[in-house]
Amino acid sequence: LLYGLMLRSGNDAALMIADYVGGDVDNFVLMMNKKAKEVGMKNTKFVNPSGLDKNGIGNYSTSYDMALLTRYAMQNDIYREIVKTKSYVAKSNLKTYVWKNKNKLLNYKYITGGKTGFTENARRTLVSTATYDGMNFIVVTIRDSDDWNTHLDLYESAFKNYKNYLVLSKKNYNVLEDKYYDNLYIKNDLYIPLTKSEATSLISHVKLERIRNYDNTLVGHNYIYLRDKKIYDMPVYAKKNKDKVTFWSKIKGLFR
């Protein structure tokens, strides 16, 4: 069903999945809208699982919200496998079906997935994802009659102008000097795709909580800003604190 849904836009598959997962279609739509809020989609409302308009009324969303949803979905291994599949063979007791993916962009070597769409209100819509030089990209277009070429042009421009910059290094996270904590660290490197001008406009700000006893404890956050807009929040940890030995405690220890 998932392959039929994603490769061939099977609306019948969408309804069957909704009924099975949600108990009924209406409840599944409620689940869809709840998930949209969790993902951060502020300008989206789902009215059915197929995406089709009914009596001139249908789901509504924005390119940005669809990009947020796609980023969330690409974290799922099964989803990533399905959307990059060019063709799938489905067999029943009576017949064998070969479903070819409608996403022609899969022939472009950097493409990792995506989804085509069409409704009377939105016309041609297309979401695609690509990976290049360690960077992941998402392009979303709505009402674009030449969407294939638009996506290719945008990717070529992005690949040319963006570079994956190491903003925070796990190995060399020693730029912060703080007398309260010893051995602050982060768990992962932070790479961010940026243009040259953006790379020179980043601001790093660290905010720490004062915790008395810590043992590999979350003690704060390293915020990254681009032109006054927060674009990343990196958790900061402190290794186990060691009891400080004072001069008088050393003297006292001599008489034990």
Identify what each model region corresponds to.
Residues 1-67:
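Active-site-adjacent loops and short helices of periplasmic peptidoglycan-processing enzymes
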Residues 41, 45, 57-256:
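Domain-terminus/edge residues, biased toward the C-terminal soluble/receptor-binding domains
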